[in-house]
């Protein structure tokens, strides 16, 4: 894990030093019909780490289904906390595969992706796609040490009236996690 992070940082530094780096070309290659070209572009973006997150987040919002799929997969593989908000937003994507990859990415982030997810549930608890994706993520995360914090949110997601019960359960879970300092109590909402 440490070697992966160091490699991503080194690649990010070398790319940021180059003027006019071909990052946009890599994003464009995510829509290629050529599987090998698309996978190579995604791997290059993942190797960039945090530096690729803003462009991937934009591709996740504006690209076609294939581009959004690749962007969601790349953001999940990068796994930095900055990738969580766009992945949370992708839980509402029209394509099931994109929503699934966003959930898998958030599960892989563990607690790093939890705060933006809980915020989204507080603000948009009426979104069916968001609740379905959140259920997938929270169900997996509640299997570990986060169970006592997330079990009420999971119960609310499975409730007869989740649109009413989920925002409050998410608020209380976030409040408990902040009190235990498991998540920071400052969070910048970005969309």
Label each PLM-derived region with a short phrase.
Residues 2-20, 28, 35-50, 55-61, ...:
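Structural detector for internal amphipathic alpha-helices that build alpha-solenoid repeat scaffolds
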């Amino acid at each position: 894990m440490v070697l992966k992070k160091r490699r991503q940082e080194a690649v990010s530094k070398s790319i940021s030093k180059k003027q006019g780096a071909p990052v946009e070309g890599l994003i464009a290659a995510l829509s290629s019909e050529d599987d090998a070209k698309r996978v190579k572009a995604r791997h290059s973006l993942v190797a960039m780490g945090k530096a690729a997150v803003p462009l991937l987040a934009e591709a996740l919002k504006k690209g076609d289904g294939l581009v959004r799929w690749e962007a969601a997969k790349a953001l999940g593989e990068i796994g930095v906390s900055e990738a969580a908000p766009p992945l949370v937003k992708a839980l509402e994507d029209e394509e099931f595969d994109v929503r699934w990859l966003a959930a898998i990415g958030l599960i892989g982030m563990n607690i790093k992706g939890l705060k933006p997810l809980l915020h989204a549930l507080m603000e948009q608890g009426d979104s069916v796609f968001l609740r379905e994706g959140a259920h997938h993520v929270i169900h997996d995360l509640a299997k570990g040490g986060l169970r006592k914090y997330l079990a009420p949110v999971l119960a609310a997601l499975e409730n007869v009236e989740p649109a009413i019960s989920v925002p409050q359960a998410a608020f209380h879970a976030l409040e408990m996690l902040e009190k235990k300092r498991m998540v920071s109590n400052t969070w910048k909402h970005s969309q």
